[in-house]
Amino acid sequence: KFVTEAKRLVYGDAGIDMIAGPTEAFIIADESANPSWVAADMLAQAEHDVDAQSVLVTFTEDFAKKVSEEIEKQLETLPTAKTARQSIDKNGLIIIAESLEVASKIANGKAPEHLELAMDQGENRIKLMELTHNYGTLFIGHQAAEVLGDYAAGLNHILPTSGAAKFTGGLSVRMFLKTVTTLRTEQNSDGSLKEGVKHSIKTASILGHTEGLTAQARAAK
């Protein structure tokens, strides 16, 4: 929150990457996943802040129930349980999807900061990898816990939140580079205009008249 407010204060005077919202974990898990591990990953996000979002999409009521029970069990011994429980109660969600396509549609619509595919290697996991494309970072496999990306594996930790992954990626040097463009026109050796310039003049003139900007059209000619 403090970093976000600092960015708001300097925005317009200095370049920033993005205004980040609460941290997000979005997990797609099937019956091959360990409910205890899935619950641990959800709580790892929930303990950050009461506004943190932990979402699980799975495919059976039985697995959803197992994860829910594990969350309650782990909260009992979690030192940060007060914050984590408020986060789970406020923003935690377990969704039962009827198919991989539905699960991917939900994920792409959410465009989460962190997307985990807690599934065995195989056709279903490959299919989800192909269907999902809106996320900050993708974590593939049962052992690919989001915390490894944050702390140890070297992945980008400054990622888009609040749906921004639909149109941008994580922080990179490119965000602090400035792009400028240049237009130069030249004549042929006989003093005539090059064909490209002629076409540009005609196009600009037509658009100027179409928009009712006569001076623009005249300037083109």
Predicted regions and their residues:
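Electropositive phosphate-/nucleotide-binding environments in soluble metabolic enzymes
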Residues: 19, 32, 36-40, 57, ...
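Structural motif
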Residues: 1, 17, 24-27, 53-55, ...
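A glycine- and small/hydrophobic-rich beta-loop-beta segment
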Residues: 48, 52, 56-135
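C-terminal segments
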Residues: 130-221
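Structural signal for hydrophobic packing residues in well-ordered secondary-structure cores
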Residues: 6-14, 33, 46-50, 67-79, ...
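Short, glycine-/Ser/Thr-/acidic-enriched flexible segments
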Residues: 1-2, 32-34, 61-62, 100-102, ...
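Conserved NAD(P)+-binding/catalytic subdomain of aldehyde/semialdehyde dehydrogenases
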Residues: 1-53
